[in-house]
Amino acid sequence: MVQIWQMEPYPCGDPRLPHHLFPPKKITPDELSKRTGTLYWKLDTLDQVALAKRLTTLKLEHNFKKEDIFTLDAETTANFDDKIEELFEESSVPFEQARMIIEGSAYYDVEDKNGQWVRIFCEYGDLILIPSNTCFRFTTTPKNFVKMRRFYKEEEGN
């Protein structure tokens, strides 16, 4: 089951740690959608037909024309710490972001309508869709490894 929570307002230290509020404030996928517009699916990766259908539907409904595989690994990524720092910078883009975790795990942080950060723990089989013009950031977990499929609209160009 997916883990989603409201983050502490001023996280300090390693961004790869959970940064829960105390006491933790868990959020459901429905609440995530209402607060941020972000959509979440847990894909059945063992059912290749259902998986292909879900991804085809995603691509058609959201006009994703291209995709790639992105790997972030402390053992093989050059300047890993710099890359983590770069990816954890808040950003907002004018197009939707779709990501599916195919190995490892990562955190996606999405800013809600009230300026509070919501953290999504994404692992194997998780697919998220972050709406356009939504502030977000990304980091690995302390395991320092994630491999994902990224889906793009044609005009994005990476």
Swiss-Prot record:
Its main location: cytoplasm. InterPro entries: ARD (IPR004313), ARD_euk (IPR027496), RmlC-like_jellyroll (IPR014710), RmlC_Cupin_sf (IPR011051). This is Acireductone dioxygenase 3. Pfam families: ARD (PF03079). GO terms for molecular function: acireductone dioxygenase (Ni2+-requiring) activity; acireductone dioxygenase [iron(II)-requiring] activity. Its cofactor is Fe(2+); Ni(2+). Catalyzes 2 different reactions between oxygen and the acireductone 1,2-dihydroxy-3-keto-5-methylthiopentene (DHK-MTPene) depending upon the metal bound in the active site. Fe-containing acireductone dioxygenase (Fe-ARD) produces formate and 2-keto-4-methylthiobutyrate (KMTB), the alpha-ketoacid precursor of methionine in the methionine recycle pathway. Ni-containing acireductone dioxygenase (Ni-ARD) produces methylthiopropionate, carbon monoxide and formate, and does not lie on the methionine recycle pathway. Binds either 1 Fe or Ni cation per monomer. Iron-binding promotes an acireductone dioxygenase reaction producing 2-keto-4-methylthiobutyrate, while nickel-binding promotes an acireductone dioxygenase reaction producing 3-(methylsulfanyl)propanoate. Belongs to the acireductone dioxygenase (ARD) family. Its EC number is 1.13.11.54, 1.13.11.53. Keywords: Amino-acid biosynthesis, Cytoplasm, Dioxygenase, Methionine biosynthesis, Nucleus, Oxidoreductase. One of its GO terms (biological process) is L-methionine salvage from methylthioadenosine. CDD domains: cupin_ARD. Pathway: Amino-acid biosynthesis; L-methionine biosynthesis via salvage pathway; L-methionine from S-methyl-5-thio-alpha-D-ribose 1-phosphate: step 5/6.
